[in-house]
């Protein structure tokens, strides 16, 4: 897919630093090394598509009614095979963190943050640290709102049932999904799409995961 941002509701550009990039035409994923695929320097192996001056390019889709009309369970089912309850029940207690708790730096594999059940309005903050790596990514499921700040580096999938806000200068190598808005960013987020298992990166070892992670975590 050549989509950087996909939203069911409206979208707007805030901040001079906003920009999206795609791999240049004629260059396949297989032409690049793993290091090049994960490089967050837009001057390397990428072409500018969207920015504040030019507006949204072809890689930004918003107002998609199929997303706007989807329930939280519909969206969840596009990325995970088990239901939320089933997945929660498969995780050991060490992988279930209370609402508002932060994932420890250095963590890999799958974590559920928040209670099992109806989406929570409790905010979880991840401020700094490194979570996940290319050979053992993290799958973070936050039942509630999530704020990512500082110079956090996360490799893997982030799934938020509530609202997502970004401050600071975090780097995320993977994908971010949020069931509810509005979602906002006042910092400088570096988001490098990493498909893990379908577009040139090998299937990772997701510790304690019952999730299916092909292609774009799941092509839909």
Located regions from the model:
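Primarily marks folded extracellular/lumenal domains of secretory and cell-surface proteins
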Residues: 1-220
